[in-house]
Each structure stands twice: as structure tokens, then as C-alpha cells.
Amino acid sequence: MSAKISLVSFFSLVPFAPACPLQGGRAFAVKIAMPEIYVSTDVEADGPIPGPHSMLSLASAAYLPNKTLVSTFAANLETLPGASGHPETMAWWQTQAEAWDACRKELLSPHVAMKNYLAWLKRLPGRPVFVAYPAAYDFMFVYWYLIRFTGESPFSHSALDIKTYAMALLRKEYREATKDNMPKRWFDQLPHTHLALDDAIEQGALFCNMLAENVGMKCE
């Protein structure tokens, strides 16, 4: 498991709310909303659903809206007791030897991995928003594991799907909002390797570029 915090100062990310004086000598604190942190997440699994099958690897890359990479998290997980790999998924893994070897090293129990992940999410200097491509698959595993092993989800029940966001920006039907139909300017020169952390970083940068274009913001 690894959790990396960048050298970006916490206090440069979160606005300071000083006490404001009132007549009579009392003061009150100004409440300022925490910024959103976009937690681009990728999982690798040995089947289509959690429970009968297991999440093998979990990685997240936490981005500010301006594409500043604040922190990363990665963990490889032991398989669930009584679970087994789905035949079709395991056949696919046979074509991905390097990625399979990478996600079977330094294994943590699901309980330890998810406790560590929850603590990492709570240390982020903002409100975490789950982001993935496709969100339905990755969020299904992460939410199930968070509730099963920690009893809570900092993401609540919500996730942001990059493909759906692209559908809106491109004004295309959902099935046409594929990466092949996305403009090249949205893509940074980052690898997509089926190593969970690489993929989380790559798709997080993609989302931030889309966000910047949508709201007219400059990325780092």
C-alpha cells in the first residue's frame, strides 16, 4: 500500500476563516466551504461484481479542479474468503501478465486496505468526489468494500462518470461519447497500463481537462 501527499501546502489549498469581531467583544468564525477534491479512481478485479469476486487492486489520484495532483493512494488486496475469479475475467488476465503480477504483490487484507483508504480520504483538504471511467464499475467495488469493511463512505452514494460528462460536453449520444470521439486536447501524454495507479492518474488528468474547458478555467 502507498499513500503519497504532494508538497502542496495544506494552507494554500484551504481558505483560512478568521474570527470576525462584533460589538461587545465577541467574535464569530466565518464558515467557508471546503473545495471539491476530484478523486479519480481505478480498480482491478477478478470478476464483474464484489462478493462472489474480489477487488484485487485499488488506486486513487486526488486532483484539485486546476489539475494539481494533491495526493495518491494505492493498495493491492487479498481476495475475499470464499470468492473466486470469474472465468471470463481470468481469461482476460492471462493476456495481462505484467499487470497481474503487479496487483498480486504486497497484499493487504481488505479490512486493513479499506481502513487505510478511508483515513487517506479523510485527510484530503476538501470534499472528495468519486470520479471514474466508467464510474458504475469502479464505484460498485469501492462502495461495497468501504461499507463492508469500514461501515461508511466519504463519497456518500454518488459518483461522477467521465463518459457521461463527455456526452454532455460533446453533445453526443452516450454510446458515441467514447475516447476515440473525444478531442485530443483533452488527453495528456500519460500511460494507460491497467496498473491501477497509472490509470487513475491518467483519467484524472482527462477529467480535469474536460472540467477546465467546460467552466473556462486554466489548468496547471
Q: Which residues does each PLM region occupy?
A:
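Serine residues within intrinsically disordered or low-complexity segments
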Residues: 2, 6-12
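Aromatic (phenylalanine/tyrosine) cluster motif
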Residues: 10-11, 16, 28
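Catalytic phosphate/metal-binding cores of nucleic-acid and nucleotide-processing enzymes, i.e., regions
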Residues: 35, 52-55, 139-154, 167-172
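Conserved non-catalytic scaffold segment of RNase H-like nuclease domains
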Residues: 35-39, 44-133
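Active-site-proximal helix-loop-helix substrate-binding element of RNase H-like nuclease domains
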Residues: 79-82, 90, 94, 162-201
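Acidic, Mg2+-coordinating catalytic module of metal-dependent nucleases/exonucleases
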Residues: 129-135, 140-141, 178-220
